[in-house]
Amino acid sequence: MRASRGFTLIELMVVMVIISVLIGLAVLSTGFASTSRELDSEAERLAGLIGVLTDEAVLDNREYGLRLERDAYQVLRYDEAKARWLPVARDSHRLPEWAELTFELDGQPLVLAGSKGEKEQKKGTDQPQLLILSSGELSPFRLRLAERGPEGRALSLSSDGFRLPRVEVARR
């Protein structure tokens, strides 16, 4: 009887095919769906933030607001002693470079500032577009979070002023 000393060519080819298929699946699963998943995550994060701010506004009897830009948003709170809006955190939350926000207040589209240069020009107008009141009410709004470009996916958050926003797939 003859002892076998190694693998046959067929066995090596089968292993190579299996490894190739697994690498291909790994590349596909991380490459194409990552922006879609990240968009979902950003929309859920924003909806959750609005929900938490609504609860905090009622519990602390304090007014909150969201200052929106095309590529970022920032939480503000109203300081009654100073009679102005102050940022809760030092920096605003930046969206990924492939994402952008659009905003409608009471059915009217608002033009959002886009870059830091535009923001610095309007430094005195640090008013929030979305109000979260201590009564538990919100400004009636529709916010659209989308991938830039004509084929990009878009998600929508909206509220009639009394209900918390839900994330929905937006129509292009």
Curated annotation (Swiss-Prot):
It holds the Pfam family GspH. The gene is xcpU. It comes from Pseudomonas aeruginosa (strain ATCC 15692 / DSM 22644 / CIP 104116 / JCM 14847 / LMG 12228 / 1C / PRS 101 / PAO1). The chain crosses the membrane at residues 7-27. This is Type II secretion system protein H. The lineage of its organism: Bacteria, Pseudomonadati, Pseudomonadota, Gammaproteobacteria, Pseudomonadales. Gene3D superfamilies: minor pseudopilin epsh domain. Type II secretion is composed of four main components: the outer membrane complex, the inner membrane complex, the cytoplasmic secretion ATPase and the periplasm-spanning pseudopilus. Forms the tip of the type II pseudopilus by interacting with XcpV, XcpW and XcpX. Interacts with core component XcpT. The modification N-methylphenylalanine is found at F7. Component of the type II secretion system required for the energy-dependent secretion of extracellular factors such as proteases and toxins from the periplasm. Part of the pseudopilus tip complex that is critical for the recognition and binding of secretion substrates. Type II pseudopilus confers increased bacterial adhesive capabilities. Residues 1-6 form a propeptide. Cleaved by prepilin peptidase. Methylated by prepilin peptidase at the amino group of the N-terminal phenylalanine once the leader sequence is cleaved by prepilin peptidase. One of its GO terms (biological process) is bacterial-type flagellum-dependent swarming motility. InterPro entries: N_methyl_site, Pilin-like, T2SS_GspH, T2SS_protein-GspH, TypeII_GspH. NCBIfam families: IV_pilin_GFxxxE, typeII_sec_gspH. Keywords: Cell inner membrane, Cell membrane, Membrane, Methylation, Protein transport, Transmembrane, Transmembrane helix, Transport. It is found in: Cell inner membrane. Belongs to the GSP H family. GO terms for cellular component: plasma membrane; type II protein secretion system complex. It is a single-pass membrane protein.
